[in-house]
Regions:
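Metallocofactor- and cofactor-centric catalytic cores in central/energy metabolism, strongly enriched
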Residues: 2-289
Length: 289
């Protein structure tokens, strides 16, 4: 197919190559016809930074930015590239990568914190907008927080009040973001051999926020220069995200809004109506309700 260009001569995206969806293809072509700039056209026009794509540009201090591009002929012998502070290409790449991990973990985990705060508010009966919709899921996750679901009465086990269980789970769940000691509770959900491997390599997260903060600390100028140690902290923060903030958000949302189940629905650009004001809500933040 011939290269597409707009009236100014800028390269345009091929609608068929940009998306497999016919509706999206149609609207990309329409946007181009109307002269509307889209992400697809900008991607076709913009050449990625050759140094940035290798992760070897450091902007962590005011002496830089330092660029350590690979020589065109490659590296023969020892890699002697260093930034002004002495950071190697490996160190710079590791710093940049784990800062991206910190950003992603912060976004995921702060979503989970918001859910936990709403859950706590619902458990305290501070709002009528949210209630426990899936008590069975609450009973299923309670043991992971060392919350008893039954109480002994005259030698017989009786079910505890669901509101009492919810309040105790909520308080302990919210504590996972900033507790001073121990490790994340949900780590024990992993298969035992995997958990032991995490413990042996020293990457068990202590709490969610601490691992994100420690990445920002270690990647600051004059702190950690060992790329292996930096990547180790990146692993720890990733586990804090996946087995902490994200998993807590999933479970608490299930309790608050009901555990999801498969359903059939229509979803595409064709659901929009020409004679209506179309409002599209996108995302996975149910507490916006």
């Amino acid at each position: 197919m011939a290269e597409l260009k707009n009236v100014k001569g800028a390269k345009l995206a091929d609608p068929v190559g940009a998306s497999i969806d016919p509706g999206t293809q149609e609207l990309i072509a329409l946007a181009q016809k109307l002269g509307i700039d889209t992400v697809f056209d900008r991607a076709a026009q913009m050449k990625p930074c050759a140094i940035g794509i290798q992760g070897i540009c450091c902007k962590n201090c005011a002496m830089g930015p330092c660029r350590l591009p690979l020589p065109k002929g490659g590296i023969e012998g020892k890699d002697t590239r260093k930034g002004l502070c002495g950071a190697t290409a490996n160190t710079i790449a590791a710093r940049n990568f784990i800062r991206m991990i910190a950003g992603g973990a912060a976004a995921h985990s702060d979503h989970g914190r918001c859910v936990a705060e709403v859950f706590l508010s619902a458990a305290r009966k501070e709002t009528d907008a949210y209630k426990i919709k899936d008590p069975n899921k609450l009973l299923a996750i309670a043991p992971w927080f060392d919350v008893a679901t039954t109480v002994d009465v005259d030698g017989a086990a009786q079910d505890r009040n669901i509101d009492e269980i919810a309040l105790e789970v909520a308080e302990k769940a919210l504590n996972e973001w900033g507790k001073a000691e121990g490790e994340l509770r949900y780590l024990k959900r992993a298969p035992a051999p995997l958990y032991e491997k995490w413990a042996k390599t020293g990457v068990l997260p202590r709490n969610i926020d601490r691992e994100i903060v420690e990445i920002m600390h270690r990647t600051h100028m004059g702190v950690d220069q060992d790329y292996k140690n930096l990547m180790k902290q990146g692993t720890r923060a990733s586990l804090a995200d996946g087995w902490g903030g994200s998993m807590l958000a999933t479970d608490l949302q299930d309790v608050l809004f009901g555990t999801p189940y498969p359903l059939q629905a229509e979803a595409n650009l064709g659901v929009m109506k020409e004679d209506h004001v179309n409002i599209i809500v996108h995302g996975h933040e149910p507490v916006l309700s």
